[in-house]
Amino acid sequence: MPDLHINGLDHVAIRVKDLERSAQWYQRVLGLKRYQPEAWGPFPIFMLAGRSGIALFPKRPGDPDQLQRSDIDHFAFNVDLETLHQAKERYTKLGLRFDLQDHTYFHSIYTQDPDGHTVELTAIVVAEDDFYKDV
């Protein structure tokens, strides 16, 4: 049976307490573009970088105020090293808490959105052809 041809990750859907607050956060902090066709109604709100991103959905009626994040630990956006450094400066100016990590082949910066979802930006720091040679 042949492998499926996956083009890439399209979106990660998350539940948030306040759709507008979350949409504004993803735009202000990460520079994602809002995409919300009228035909969809009030949600979801897609926050996109190119053709991939986050789909924001409101919390369900009856959900606790502290939303459960299921088994998702975090989600990551791929950036170049210059953008990673720009993110550090931007997060500092915005007063956001963040964590920098060296993953040998990648460097990453982590922060949390208003609902506590961990958002990572990651940049490869070795030759991509070497790292992805067996993929």
Predicted regions and their residues:
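Short, conserved charged micro-motifs
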Residues: 21-22, 82-87
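Core segments of cupin and vicinal oxygen chelate
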Residues: 14-54
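Short beta-strand micro-motifs in enzyme catalytic cores
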Residues: 43-45, 73, 107-109
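Conserved Rossmann-like nucleotide-cofactor binding loop
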Residues: 52, 82, 117
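Vicinal oxygen chelate
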Residues: 1-5, 88-89, 93-135
